[in-house]
């Protein structure tokens, strides 16, 4: 418990210098923390040790008595709380959904993770997507797939970058955007989602003029396209997408301003929840989220455009969402039960003292 308090203090102080996401990964989501050359247990390992310690409590023969039932219930609630926290830490995900008025969306974009999408746009009726997740986007990694008749070699992954126009002609090996621009690496921002990642890669073994070195970055206004053996491909670096079994259509976005200011007081999104052909109208407001199929949609922010407004919904999937509520109720029951067993003895001792 004392070491957990130290971790909370260190992680809280570190947020000022390294940002929330990096501090969380270093102190709370890690198994081991290195203090210079000394390894120490991280947040996950510490909580596992505490959980094991709590579980061993139930193997004590002396506790299985009626008069200690409240303590047993209390410890069971604590184990349940830690189990729910483990589920949240290991399997929960969060991102956002950006929808313009009148448009629909069926995917969530991750705040931190990226993916490389290679889209075959040759067919008239559909596009074929081949996705490579961020763990594969590292230096000297060779990307192959049965859907692709070429190879992509990752030359460099830039955590944060900006494009800059070339001051001298590029060599013949540079293709696409890199013929006119370079990607300059920048110092990463404290907050991870403020970064603009970039990728420098090489296309190999096409047997065509498409072989060469390319560059792309997050939010690139003109997508990188390439034609290889009569097939057209679009290559995009984007935030990792999670596709949902339903769609959300934004009907109307409303915001209320503080009187006499341009500062929003509250805002809401009137949406259609579309699933298997069925349409249900829902209003998402601040502090009144939509919960559906394990996902929770919060009204996060908005984007004002010249002709329409765009809503930004924060989306969370938390498998351990109910555990804090359930475990808190169980622990309260355990405490009340324990107090109800102890109060008669306390009253009796008080009466004996008064009598004396």
PLM regions: where:
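Soluble non-transmembrane domains of integral membrane proteins
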Residues: 91, 95-318
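Cytoplasmic C-terminal tails of single-pass
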Residues: 348-356
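Membrane-embedded alpha-helical segments of integral membrane proteins
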Residues: 1-63
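A broadly tuned "polar low-complexity/structure-edge" signature
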Residues: 3-11, 50-57, 61, 67, ...
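Internal alpha-helical transmembrane segments
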Residues: 40-124, 312, 316-349
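Long, intrinsically disordered, low-complexity accessory segments associated with secretion
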Residues: 3-4, 24-28, 44, 87, ...
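Active-site-proximal structural scaffolding
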Residues: 2, 48, 69-72, 76, ...
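Short hydrophobic alpha-helical segments that form membrane-spanning helices or hydrophobic packing faces
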Residues: 4-5, 84, 299-302, 334
């Amino acid at each position: 418990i004392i070491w957990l308090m130290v971790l909370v203090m260190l992680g809280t102080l570190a947020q000022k210098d390294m940002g929330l996401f990096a501090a969380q990964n270093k102190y709370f989501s890690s198994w081991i923390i290195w203090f210079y050359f000394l390894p120490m247990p991280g947040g996950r390992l510490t909580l596992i040790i505490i959980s094991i310690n709590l579980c061993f409590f139930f193997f004590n023969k002396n506790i299985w008595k009626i008069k200690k039932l409240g303590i047993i219930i209390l410890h069971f609630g604590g184990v349940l709380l830690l189990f729910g926290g483990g589920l949240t830490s290991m399997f929960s995900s969060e991102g956002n959904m950006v929808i313009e008025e009148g448009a629909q969306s069926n995917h969530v974009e991750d705040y931190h993770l990226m993916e490389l999408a290679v889209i075959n746009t040759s067919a008239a009726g559909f596009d074929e997507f081949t996705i490579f997740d961020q763990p594969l986007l590292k230096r000297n990694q060779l990307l192959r797939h049965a859907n692709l008749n070429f190879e992509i070699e990752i030359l460099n992954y830039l955590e944060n970058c900006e494009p800059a126009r070339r001051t001298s002609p590029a060599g013949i090996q540079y293709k696409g955007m890199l013929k006119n621009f370079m990607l300059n690496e920048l110092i990463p921002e404290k907050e991870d989602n403020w970064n603009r990642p970039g990728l420098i890669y090489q296309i190999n073994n096409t047997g065509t003029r498409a072989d060469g070195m390319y560059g792309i970055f997050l939010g690139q206004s003109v997508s990188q396209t390439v034609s290889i053996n009569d097939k057209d491909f679009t290559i995009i670096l984007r935030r990792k997408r999670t596709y949902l079994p339903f769609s959300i259509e934004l009907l109307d976005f409303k915001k209320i301003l503080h009187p006499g200011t341009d500062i929003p007081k509250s805002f809401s999104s009137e949406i259609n929840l579309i699933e298997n052909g069925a349409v249900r109208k829902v209003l998402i407001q601040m502090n009144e989220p939509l919960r559906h199929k394990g996902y929770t949609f919060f009204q996060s922010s908005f984007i004002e455009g010249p002709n329409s407004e765009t809503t930004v919904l924060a989306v969370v999937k938390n498998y351990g969402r109910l555990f804090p509520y359930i475990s808190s109720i169980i622990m309260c029951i355990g405490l009340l039960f324990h107090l109800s067993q102890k109060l008669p003895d306390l009253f009796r001792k008080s009466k004996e003292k008064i009598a004396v």
